[in-house]
């Protein structure tokens, strides 16, 4: 957490410094305050600081507050996911991938705290976890149980985070027996 706390604190200072120029530069206070909220999340408030709701969206206040950050996150996802599938099947009815692939599924377990889900599928559960830090065991267990519940209903389930490489993969690896994973 310390590295991300330092990173977002550094951005707060940078953007606040730019805002000191006054005039139109005062707009830099918006991304500065967004980074301040992110720093607070990594300082100990956790994923709940980002206020992702049960419908996959953030509270209205946080959605406006974090808009500059959402734009950067979306650009980052586009960069890292260029030329690769947004989701892949890893076991029967279990897919892992980016939150951007959620619109293709009727069942989604969303572990992405930092980016909203714009179109909620019929069967949806959010277990928001912070990016780039070890997930809490209780959150992983909750996400695995939700995945199993949706999977038992016989529908394909997407477990997603921002890119589909970390948090979502951890949930899937905890839920799928090793023998059920593809060999390649």
Which residues does each PLM region occupy?
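A phosphate-binding catalytic loop at a beta-strand-loop-alpha-helix junction
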Residues: 154-173
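Short, electropositive, low-hydrophobicity segments enriched in small/polar residues
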Residues: 48-50, 101, 168-170
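Generic low-polarity alpha-helical segments
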Residues: 68, 173-176
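N-terminal membrane-anchoring alpha-helices
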Residues: 1-80
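Secondary-structure junction/capping motif
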Residues: 59-62, 168, 183
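Cysteine-based protein phosphatase catalytic domain of the PTP/DSP
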Residues: 74-159, 177-184
